[in-house]
């Protein structure tokens, strides 16, 4: 078994010729979100992958073996639900609204300019159809969005090496001298609570409304 314990995001730093000659391995999302797994590459070799905990493998990434061998990862086609807006009964904004509701449920979700993709779930499919969205089944690679803070560092986009501290020069007068108070005049600060914004049941409303509609897409 060939042991691979290093991950290069998108083959960073490798010459195109090396990437072209590298063996490949097709992995679906269920496998690629694991840090340890077994697989078989395009040359028929058994692979044992041991990556740091929390690693996520994306299509186009390159796994590096202990002996320096390279294996390029291909996101394998798998069953997905493809969600598109219905131009007859809605608008493209419905996709944004659907992404909001799916995100609240922590559903792994792939975002594309004209569609959403998620793993098959009949309950979610019914919910999306009730929102007047078109839901269909397909075989396609699945690359869900990563967490805002989770995967970026593993793929080299973190800011751990950057110093974001801001130095402010507060002179002695600024740091220790209070502003003078006018004599003979009380000091007070009027605090007025902001009036709550009226609730508008428009396309941006986050509530689910039962329209009693029998549309089927």
From Swiss-Prot:
Biased composition annotated in UniProt, kind: Low complexity: 193-202
Keywords: Chaperone, Cytoplasm, Nickel, Nickel insertion
A Pfam family assignment: UreE_C
GO molecular function: nickel cation binding; unfolded protein binding
Protein origin, superkingdom: Bacteria
GO biological process: protein folding; protein-containing complex assembly; urea metabolic process
Bias-annotated ranges (Basic and acidic residues): 160-171, 206-217
Protein name: Urease accessory protein UreE
Keyword Cytoplasm tagged: yes
SMART domains tied to this protein: UreE_N
Lineage of source species: Bacteria, Pseudomonadati, Pseudomonadota, Betaproteobacteria, Burkholderiales
InterPro entries noted in UniProt: UreE, UreE_C_dom, UreE_N, UreE_N_sf
